[in-house]
Structures are given as structure tokens and as C-alpha cells.
Amino acid sequence: MNWFLAHEKDLADVFAEAERIVSGFPAPLDHIGLAYLATFDGRKEESTKNYICYLLPYWMKDITELQPESINKLSLANVFVMLYYFIQDDIMDSAKGEHKDKLPLANLFHMQFLSTYREMFPAGSPFWSYYETYIMEWSEAVSNEQQSDYFHHDIGKVAKKASPVKNASTGALLLSNQAHLIPVVTAAVEQTLITLQMLDDWADWEEDLEEGSYNCLVASLRKHLQLSTDSTVSPEMVKQQLYVHDFLDLYGQIAIIHHEQLLGLQISMTQMINFHDSLVENILRGSNEIKNSRKMLAQGGLNYFLSKSS
């Protein structure tokens, strides 16, 4: 896990700076903002971890020679990018408008990362063209997700739901005069984002199923069972496939193929590759834990039967 541990001190500084900035927001947005930031604070054990958002600039050190100050700024900007887009997601996923009070806060987050980028990239920099492209990619991906089976018909769109994360990788390459690497690094980042979404969707499938949100695991299961897109998938059906028929095994094999594709790009981003490997291992470990639990239950049932028969 060196992809994280090697950057703990830098991350502590970045999140401390983010706290300082948010503390300066007008009341009550300062308190609301600090509470929201704490939810995703990479320093806190109980927080929701979104490692790629704030670690990607540090992983870029594997192929760039940027000054630490520039890397820290890209990480800080991506923290605010993360917070801004998570609020967008909260609002879009909310049926009753319960997150609308976060809209003013989102605009302050937006102001912060835009201010950082303006410090780093002049108006004529190609960065701004990429910046706009990533917004367009995100907008299209989240708008059409419910009507399309991205995971099977346009898998790149799965990654594009997090396209603004790429501000960090593209920004780092432009600052280091390595624009020629943008296509291959973008492909590597997107491959990682796809597998990360697979892992998230395994964790969130019940909630997504209840809310009617698109979910890669459920979509994969639907295809595996040859169900039509309008067929109902019940929680019981998913549980049976996961815990009885080892569907997570098949899901894990897809993640393994993704890792092979990532390695095939032949980009020397060792930390991000190791991070991706940990994602794959998490899925495979989950599959093995299900099998072991089932085996223990079966043995327990036999022991119970024998004890009753003796």
C-alpha cells in the first residue's frame, strides 16, 4: 500500500490547507463545508476513501519531475473537485431535493479549484481545453447513464462519470512539458476508474437497486442471466447469484482482464498500477470469503446434524 503510505504527510498538509480554506467560508457554510470535507478526509480512518482523487498527482511523480509545490496544488485542487462533484451527485440522486441546501457550498468549492488552476495555467494553456472536455464527458455520462448499459456497450463512459479527476494527470503532464503522454496516461487513469467503479458498485448494489441507479455489478449479472433490460432484478436474485452461484468470481475475472489491459499500456505509473491491483484483489478476496463462509456453514450444518444424531 505504498501508493498511499508514501504520501501520508503530504496528504495531511493538503487536507489541513483545505480545512483552513473552508473555515474561511461565510457562516453557516464554513461549518457545513467542514463537516462535508471531514466525510472524505483521507487522514481520518472512518472517512469515505476516494484515494485516486487526491493521490493521482503524487502518482504522477512516477513519470514526471514536478516541484512538490505543484503536486500539492494539484492535489488540493482535486480535493475541491471531488467535493464539488460529489455534491452534484448527491443532488442528482436525491428524489426529494434534500441536498439542495448544499448548492451554495458547491459553488464555493468550484471557486476554490478554479482559482488554483488559474494560478497554475495561463489563459492560453491547452489545460483549459482539456478542462472543458472533461466537464462535457462528465455531463454526457451522468445524463445518459440510466438509458444505456455502459458497462457492456460503452465501458469508457463508466470512467467518464469521474472525468474531472483527470485534471490532475493532464495538468501534471502539461506542467512537465510531456503533453505527448496525455493519451496513454488518460487511458490508464480511465481503466483504473472503471475498476474502481466496479468495486464501488459491488459495495453499493443494494442501495443502487433500491434507488433505480445504474450499477455495473447488477448490469453484469443481468447480462450473465440473459435478462432483458426491462426485466426486474430483485435483491434476492442478486444475493443468490453472489452467495450461492459465485457470481463475484466472474465479476473478478473481468477486473483481472482490466489489469492486463492496464499493464498492456506499458506506462511506468507503478503506484497507480499497484493501486489498481489492490482493487482487483479486493474483489477476488471478497469472492474467496464468500466461498469460505459457505464452506464453514456447510460444515457447521453437518456437525449440527451429527450431534443431533448421536
Predicted regions and their residues:
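Acidic, Mg2+-coordinating active-site segments of isoprenoid diphosphate-utilizing enzymes
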Residues: 86-101, 105-112, 174-176, 190-250
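Conserved N-terminal diphosphate/IPP-binding helix and adjacent helical/loop segment
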Residues: 1-81, 87, 123-135, 144, ...
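Primarily interfacial, aromatic-capped hydrophobic alpha-helices that serve as membrane anchors
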Residues: 118-136, 224-273
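Short, charged, low-complexity loops and linkers
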Residues: 32-41, 65-67, 92-94, 146-152, ...
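A ubiquitous short alpha-helical element
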Residues: 39-45, 73, 97-102, 151-157, ...
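All-alpha helical catalytic cores of prenyl diphosphate-utilizing isoprenoid enzymes
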Residues: 19-32, 45-52, 107, 111-210, ...
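Alpha-helix boundary/N-cap detector
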Residues: 2, 6-9, 13, 104, ...
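Short, surface-exposed loop/turn segments at secondary-structure junctions
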Residues: 68-71, 94-100, 179-182
